[in-house]
Amino acid sequence: MVPFLEVLDGIVKRGIEVRLIHAKDPGPNWCDDFDRYPTLWTAMERMLCPRVHFKCIIVDGVRAYFGSANLTGAGMGAKSEKKRNFENGVLTDDPALVEPLVEQFDSVWRGAFCRDCGRRDFCGDPVA
């Protein structure tokens, strides 16, 4: 299995925009792995939003994966067969499913919910 950060590193090296929203700062293992891909420090945009619980990957606004898996070893199936999580997800190019995901992601990214957010105390850098 190819590490997820290695996949992202390859994507940004091809000049493709990558934006990632975290609910909280990643743990030490993820940070150690992230340090192995210095291109990601400047080429990938990241933001924190403590209210984000959705897990989705959107490609060019026309294809999306959404599901239950966190971007962790257990969530992505990297753990042993007896330890990995049971997950599910959908990969689609149906505009009726993709467009609302794009709208939700972009709304959070732009800070549309920041001003009235009840969790601002947990947000390190509110967008608005």
Task: Label the model's feature ranges.
Residues M1-A128:
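PLD/PLD-like phosphodiesterase catalytic module centered on the HKD motif
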